């Protein structure tokens, strides 16, 4: 499976244990940990030996500086980025906690992803000193459990950890944030981690037996390990499976779909407590790529891939809201939206690093007696995160975030209007001139089980003259053959 190897560490200082566990997690992680899926994607690897051994029980130890690591990363990208688009970077610099300003390595990774059109996955970092975090978290931790560099990279997908296994004596229970997993937010209060996945647990005596994740050692034996280093490749595997299924490869779309899956899976969790997003990010994506890429009949997922220019906006009037979700003059249903884009970045502005903002509104318009049309968005940003004042929106919301999440369960109904509309707006900081910005908007509308709202919406769009295409995947092509 290793198609290329670059060695920047002399053989006597090499330790392949960490990377072997990571690669085995990408390739066989579901099987090794009893996580059933019929999909068996197999991937090829470019193995970059860049970081020397740091464990004296294994052999001689050495270290590497940040600048040297940056030089290695760029050299590797020069050689491989045209064909290798997904990169796992399970590392963290413990003494560089993200305290509000961007780290040098985070900025560098953003540059690399823009320059070479690749997607990098970064671990959120581990708490490596006692006490570890309980759940709910103890207040005495302060900022000790904040993410560390380079987990603040805006372009990277940062991955935290939750427990797969638990016991009577475990520090946390299944699906709770692992006791070592560093939390957000990132710089400028951007949501970090982006997603979480299984990365292990510990007993109160700090034993991992039966609580860690299973992977392979350098001899092919099954062993247990813990850490966000091992939750990160699980997210990589899911992203790579989505990307692999795409007939037309699209990194931004794959990123949006991964995070949208996480958000829709975690909607109850994130509604329980607004602070949960600091630990879970947008949640945990589905194990199966087909679950992410396909819809059931009782829901419809629409993907919009477009550009918006400065000083203008995009609108889609007369959106066909499902008739089966309209009762007694009111709209019902469950709506989740994920907006993904790549804002202009400028490290000269510190906390105002992200220079452009895109917003989406999806809601009802009504024509007044004077003939004017009134429109109001009905699907808010995360609960209690959308404030009117700039400082609050930056601290508590997603105004300058490259990923935005909107969600509403319409249980009491919304008074019927003249129709539904989608509106996309873009603005920039200090009104600087910026080029058109690409974005991906994913909207899922869910109804009661057994109600075919998928056909209602798709037929409604076609009746209104909108061109719709199914997202073509390799699975569909295989089925046709």
Regions found by a protein language model. Name each.
Residues 1-6, 162-232:
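Catalytic-core environment of secreted peptidases
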Residues 1-65, 117, 152-155, 186-192, ...:
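Subtilisin-like serine protease catalytic core
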Residues 52-153, 220-226, 230-232:
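Substrate-binding/access-modulating region of protease and related hydrolase catalytic domains
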Residues 119-193, 208-209:
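Structured lumen-facing ectodomains of secretory-pathway proteins
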Residues 231-245:
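Short, small-residue alpha-helix embedded
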Residues 278-364:
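Secreted peptidase-domain scaffold signal
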Residues 295-296, 304, 370-414:
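Extended, solvent-exposed segments with strong compositional bias
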Residues 353-367, 410-481:
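C-terminal edge strands of extracellular/lumenal beta-sandwich accessory domains
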């Amino acid at each position: 499976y290793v198609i290329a190897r670059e060695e920047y560490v002399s053989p006597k200082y090499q330790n392949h244990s960490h990377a072997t566990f990571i690669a085995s997690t990408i390739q066989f992680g579901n099987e090794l940990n009893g996580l059933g899926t019929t999909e068996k994607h197999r991937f090829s690897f470019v193995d970059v030996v860049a970081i020397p051994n740091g464990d004296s029980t294994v052999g001689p130890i050495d270290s590497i500086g940040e600048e040297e690591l940056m030089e290695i990363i760029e050299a590797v990208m020069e050689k491989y980025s045209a064909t290798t688009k997904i990169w796992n970077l399970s590392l963290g610099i413990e003494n560089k906690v993200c305290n509000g300003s961007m780290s040098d390595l985070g900025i560098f990774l953003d540059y690399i992803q823009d320059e070479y059109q690749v997607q990098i996955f970064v671990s959120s970092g581990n708490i490596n000193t006692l006490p570890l975090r309980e759940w709910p978290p103890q207040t005495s931790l302060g900022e000790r459990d904040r993410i560390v560099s380079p987990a603040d990279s805006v372009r990277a997908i940062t991955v935290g950890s939750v427990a797969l296994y638990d016991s009577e004596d475990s520090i946390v229970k299944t699906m709770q944030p692992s006791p070592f997993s560093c939390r957000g937010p990132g710089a400028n209060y951007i949501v970090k981690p982006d997603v979480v996945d299984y990365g292990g647990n510990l007993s109160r005596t700090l034993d991992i037996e039966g609580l860690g994740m299973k992977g392979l050692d350098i001899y092919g034996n099954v062993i247990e390990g813990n850490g966000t280093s091992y939750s990160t490749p699980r997210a990589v595997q899911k992203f790579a499976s989505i990307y692999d299924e795409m007939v037309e490869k699209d990194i931004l779309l794959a990123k949006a779909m991964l995070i949208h899956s996480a958000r829709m899976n975690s909607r109850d969790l994130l509604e329980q407590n607004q602070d949960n997003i600091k630990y879970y990010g947008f949640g945990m994506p589905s194990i199966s790529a087909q679950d992410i890429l396909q819809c059931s009949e009782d829901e419809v997922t629409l993907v919009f891939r477009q550009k918006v220019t400065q000083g203008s906006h995009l609108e889609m009037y007369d959106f066909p809201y499902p008739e089966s979700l309209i009762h007694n003059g009111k709209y019902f249903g469950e709506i989740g939206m994920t907006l993904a884009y790549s804002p202009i970045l400028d490290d000269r502005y510190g906390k105002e690093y992200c220079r452009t903002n895109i917003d989406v509104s999806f809601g009802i318009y009504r024509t007044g007696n004077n003939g004017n049309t009134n429109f109001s968005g009905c699907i808010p940003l995360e609960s209690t995160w959308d404030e009117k004042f700039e400082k609050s929106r930056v601290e508590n919301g997603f105004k300058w975030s490259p990923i935005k999440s909107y969600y509403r369960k319409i249980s009491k109904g919304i008074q019927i209007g003249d129709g539904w509309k989608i509106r996309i707006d873009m603005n920039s900081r200090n009104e600087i001139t910026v080029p058109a910005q690409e974005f991906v908007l994913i909207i899922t509308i869910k109804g009661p089980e057994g109600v075919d709202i998928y056909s209602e919406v798709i037929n409604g769009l076609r009746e209104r003259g909108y061109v719709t295409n199914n997202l073509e995947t390799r699975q569909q092509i295989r089925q046709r053959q």
